[in-house]
C-alpha cells in the first residue's frame, strides 16, 4: 500500500472556505441582546438539511483521542445535510477534508482546530470522522435527520494518507 504524508495546516476561515465554515467568534458579527447583557455572535455557519421529513438534530459525540501517526484510510460525506462539530472541552482536534474527484475524494487536506474553534462541513464534503487529540473529548454536533440515507463512505484501497505530527507546519 502506498502512503502519502499530509501536512497539517492551521484552521483558518480562508483556507477552509471550500469545505464549509470555521465556527469561532473572531471576526464574527456581534449583536448585543437581552438588554445588553448577552453578546450574540451571529450566523456562524450555513446549516443545510435537505430531503424528506427533514429536521435538524443536536447531538453530543464523545470522540476517542488519536495520537500521531494517524493513517487516513477512509472518508465520508453527507449528501443531504451539513454537519457541525463544536468542541465542548476546549481541546484541539484534527479536521481532514477533501474536494470531490468524481469517483471519490481528491487528495485530503488536514487542519488543526484550536479548542475554541468548531467546523461546519457543507453538504457533500468529504471528511474524515472525528479526530480528537490529547484525550477523549466531547463535541456538540449539529446534524440532519430525514428519511434518506445521509451517509456515503469511501475506503482508499491502494493507498492511504498519513499525518505524522499533529503540529502545524
Swiss-Prot record:
Q: Which UniProt keywords apply?
A: Lyase, Purine metabolism
Q: Which cofactor names does the annotation list?
A: Ni(2+)
Catalytic activity of the protein: (S)-ureidoglycolate = urea + glyoxylate
- A GO molecular-function term, please? ureidoglycolate lyase activity
Which Pfam families does the annotation name? Ureidogly_lyase
Check the record and name the Gene3D superfamilies matching this protein.
Ureidoglycolate hydrolase (2.60.120.480)
GO aspect biological process, one term: purine nucleobase catabolic process
Q: In which pathway does it act?
A: Nitrogen metabolism; (S)-allantoin degradation
Q: What PANTHER family does the annotation carry? A: UREIDOGLYCOLATE HYDROLASE, UREIDOGLYCOLATE LYASE
Tell me the protein family, please.
Belongs to the ureidoglycolate lyase family.
Function of the molecule: Catalyzes the catabolism of the allantoin degradation intermediate (S)-ureidoglycolate, generating urea and glyoxylate. Involved in the utilization of allantoin as nitrogen source.
What name has this protein been given in UniProt? Ureidoglycolate lyase
Q: Which organism is it from?
A: Brucella abortus (strain 2308)
Amino acid at each position: 500500500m502506498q502512503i502519502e504524508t499530509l501536512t497539517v495546516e492551521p484552521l483558518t476561515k480562508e483556507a477552509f472556505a471550500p469545505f464549509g465554515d470555521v465556527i469561532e467568534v473572531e471576526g464574527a458579527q456581534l449583536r448585543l441582546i437581552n438588554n445588553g447583557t448577552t453578546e450574540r455572535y451571529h450566523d456562524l455557519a450555513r446549516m443545510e438539511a435537505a430531503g424528506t421529513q427533514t429536521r435538524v438534530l443536536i447531538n453530543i459525540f464523545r470522540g476517542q483521542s488519536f495520537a500521531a501517526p494517524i493513517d487516513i484510510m477512509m472518508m465520508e460525506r453527507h449528501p443531504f445535510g451539513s454537519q457541525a462539530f463544536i468542541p465542548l472541552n476546549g481541546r484541539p482536534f484534527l479536521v481532514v477534508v477533501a474536494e470531490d474527484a468524481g469517483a471519490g475524494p481528491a487528495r485530503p487536506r488536514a487542519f488543526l482546530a484550536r479548542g475554541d474553534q468548531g467546523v461546519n462541513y457543507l453538504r457533500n464534503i468529504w471528511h474524515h470522522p472525528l479526530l480528537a487529540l490529547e484525550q477523549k473529548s466531547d463535541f456538540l454536533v449539529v446534524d440532519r435527520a430525514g428519511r434518506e440515507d445521509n451517509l456515503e463512505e469511501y475506503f482508499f484501497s491502494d493507498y492511504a494518507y498519513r499525518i505524522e505530527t499533529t503540529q502545524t507546519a
